[in-house]
Amino acid sequence: MNNNMYNAIKHHLSDNILLGYSSGSLPEAFSLMVASHISLCSTCRAQLESFDAIGGEVLNSSVETDTPMASDSLNATLALIREGPTHKPVPSRVDDRVLPRPIQDYVGGGLADVKWRAIGMGVKQAILPTSDAASARLLFIPAGAAMPDHGHQGLELTMVLQGAFKDEDDYFARGDIEMADSEMHHTPIADINEDCICLVVLDARLKFDGLIPKIMQRFAQM
């Protein structure tokens, strides 16, 4: 991906999320989101590198002063990052222009290898195999279609991989991140020019209002 792609990203990960990734404290699904985003976003990648550097200084300082570190120290959590996710996804070597390499490793290939499951109104999803602390899925929304109006019981991160969507006054294109929490109620609408594919991670179920969306939710496990 070229530098124009990097510079086009306008909606980034929060510092708290990046710090969590650097320390190894994020659930696997959220770590997948960070790894995927920084593969596209030079801004967040640089910020993460600065946090990692600070963590390295902390480690060096503790070694120099012979200060004992706790079992949940930065040293241990950084080791978790190096070890990778618990289910050990198969590395992918597919040249795919939609799925970042971290997602390809979970899919076992490129976009053509995604095992989509229809959940209603033209929307499809593919749940990715992550730990139970949070869920990760690829979501396919037809061009011009709207996701049902919903709220949140926890944190939802959505990153656009193909196409774009509009939410209130904000517009999210490839690489952009939308963060939604328990105070947010919204109805994302896919851009009419192209089908929208997103990576979505959740640490709690969504709250749908209508009867049909609630029925869909049972099948979608969202």
Residues of each region from the PLM?
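Glycine- and acidic-residue-biased ligand/ion/polar-headgroup-sensing regions
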Residues: P142-A145, G151-D167
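Amphipathic alpha-helical interface segments
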Residues: A204-M222
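Short Cys/His-rich Zn2+-coordinating modules
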Residues: L19-E28
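Conserved short histidine dyad/triad with adjacent acidic residue
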Residues: A118-K124, P129-H152, D181-H185, F219
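Positively biased amphipathic helices and basic secretion/translocation or surface-docking motifs
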Residues: M1-S14, E28-F30, S39-S42, A46, ...
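Short beta-strand His + acidic residue motifs that chelate non-heme Fe in jelly-roll/DSBH
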Residues: L48, M147-D149, E168, H186-I192
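Short acidic-glycine-tyrosine-enriched beta hairpin
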Residues: D167-H186
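Ligand-binding loop in jelly-roll beta-barrel domains
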Residues: M184-F208
